[in-house]
């Protein structure tokens, strides 16, 4: 679908039903504009979303929602004036524009002409996941996943699965004349199992997703999700209490990158650096990590959960190098913070919906691979912990301090992975941990497409990833 077709799709969904041709949008900008206004935009959004769940062998259509609305924003210096409406109409737009202008407390006017089309390479197909399977097929998919889990081992007592899909159409009209549209599909499938043995119960989970439709959940993927979830639960049934203390920790590839995302990635977002609240503020060009550590944010990877063709300000996403060979090289920016910091836009302006303000946010954030074979990394450890999967955690974004619980971990003894352990928590400081990376694997892996990031009350889909990493001297909280 080319740019004109995307715009036509968005116009048909968001503008034409409400008689909002370009002339009327021009009038809204005219009512909104002020002499010292630095920027302004209108953000139209239409979303259909559904959720299906399976528990105790029963599939339920848990949710179905249709939401639409428009957000009106004006920027003056560091100030943002914002109003939104869940009604799309010329009258509602005029009201929102007046409210926004009143917040800005400025007078005057400036015409805007919505003529230019914004263009960016497409990162996914404009699919409608909800229409890609009928209801019976969605039920059958969840039931098959349950059967696969139970068939793997008789100790599996409970299976819970969730299937979700979203079809989103957005249109961004900007005061500089650009008009950009995007059609964003999103799907997610997750499963959790509980296994029981000798009165002990343990859980395991798996799943995946991306910007595509339900066709991605092939039989092979369902079998892999079942294997991962059940195997994790069975490993935890045999796990010993984790030791506590300061030790070498090896992080597995893929989803353990969530620690990098939370404890380090947020500190590389423009707003925290502009306000001086990030541990990385004022350190551009300085060494902030061990040699060999390169961290990027890339919103252009095809079909990934965190990818976007354009961000929520209509700017094309890109690959941004944040840390290069241990040196701080870049930050993630939206238009407000890029302008105030006099730094380039990176296409990271994101919002949960039309009713939320844009913030600089991550897309797919990961550490690049190094030169070491993962087996070599394990062999180098005399005594330590191998954490291959994470559960929940807490992070202080300002300081980078974190506590993360390992959902699956093992002891490393004399260069070998030995027994599984349970109850391990990793405790540390993100920027400090970056300096303690001593070996980087050649096995970069991205997460399976399940991540959601929260910031200032807003949730957006993201991707994470990393290769196998050896971290010297990290505090481990245990139960032994």
Model-derived features: positions:
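N-terminal small-residue-enriched
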Residues: 1-480
């Amino acid at each position: 679908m080319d740019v004109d077709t995307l715009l036509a799709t968005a116009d048909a969904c968001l503008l034409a039903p409400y008689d909002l041709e370009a002339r009327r949008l021009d009038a809204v900008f005219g009512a909104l504009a002020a002499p010292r206004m630095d920027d302004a935009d209108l953000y139209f959004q239409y979303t259909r979303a559904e959720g299906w769940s399976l528990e105790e062998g029963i599939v339920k259509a848990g949710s179905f929602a249709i939401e639409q609305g428009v957000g009106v924003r004006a920027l003056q210096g560091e100030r943002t004036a914002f109003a939104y409406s869940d009604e799309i109409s010329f009258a509602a737009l005029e009201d929102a524009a007046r409210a926004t202008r009143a917040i800005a407390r400025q007078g005057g006017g400036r015409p805007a002409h919505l003529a230019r089309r914004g263009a960016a390479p497409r990162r996914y197909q404009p699919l409608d996941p909800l229409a890609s399977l009928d209801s019976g097929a969605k039920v059958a998919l969840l039931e098959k996943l349950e059967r696969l889990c139970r068939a793997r081992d008789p100790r599996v007592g409970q299976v819970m699965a969730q299937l979700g899909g979203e079809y989103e159409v957005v249109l961004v009209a900007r005061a500089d004349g650009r008009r950009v549209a995007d059609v964003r599909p999103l799907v997610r499938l997750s499963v959790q199992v509980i296994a029981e043995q000798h009165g002990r119960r343990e859980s395991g989970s798996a799943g995946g997703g991306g910007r595509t439709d339900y066709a991605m959940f092939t039989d092979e993927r369902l079998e892999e999700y079942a294997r991962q979830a059940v195997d994790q639960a069975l490993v935890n049934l045999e796990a010993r209490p984790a030791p506590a203390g300061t030790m070498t920790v090896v992080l597995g590839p893929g989803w353990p990158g969530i620690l990098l995302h939370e404890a380090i990635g947020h500190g590389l977002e423009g707003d925290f650096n502009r306000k001086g609240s990030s541990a990385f503020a004022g350190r551009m060009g300085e060494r902030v990590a061990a040699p060999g550590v390169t961290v990027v944010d890339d919103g252009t990877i095809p079909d990934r959960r965190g990818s976007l063709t354009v961000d929520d300000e209509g700017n094309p996403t890109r690959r941004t190098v944040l840390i290069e060979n241990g040196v701080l090289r870049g930050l993630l920016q939206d238009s407000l913070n890029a302008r105030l910091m006099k730094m380039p836009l990176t296409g990271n302006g994101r919002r949960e919906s039309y009713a939320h303000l844009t913030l600089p946010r991550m897309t797919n954030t990961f550490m690049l691979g190094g030169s070491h074979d993962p087996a070599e990394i394990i062999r180098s450890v005399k005594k330590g912990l191998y954490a291959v999967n994470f559960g929940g955690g807490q992070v202080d974004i300002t300081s980078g301090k974190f506590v993360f619980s390992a959902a699956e971990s093992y002891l490393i003894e004399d260069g070998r992975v030995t027994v599984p352990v349970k109850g391990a928590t990793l405790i540390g400081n993100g920027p400090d941990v970056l300096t303690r990376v001593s070996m980087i694997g050649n096995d970069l892996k991205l997460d399976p497409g399940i991540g959601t990031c929260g910031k200032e009350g807003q949730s957006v889909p993201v991707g994470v990833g990393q290769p196998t990493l050896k971290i010297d001297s990290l505090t481990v909280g245990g139960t032994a």
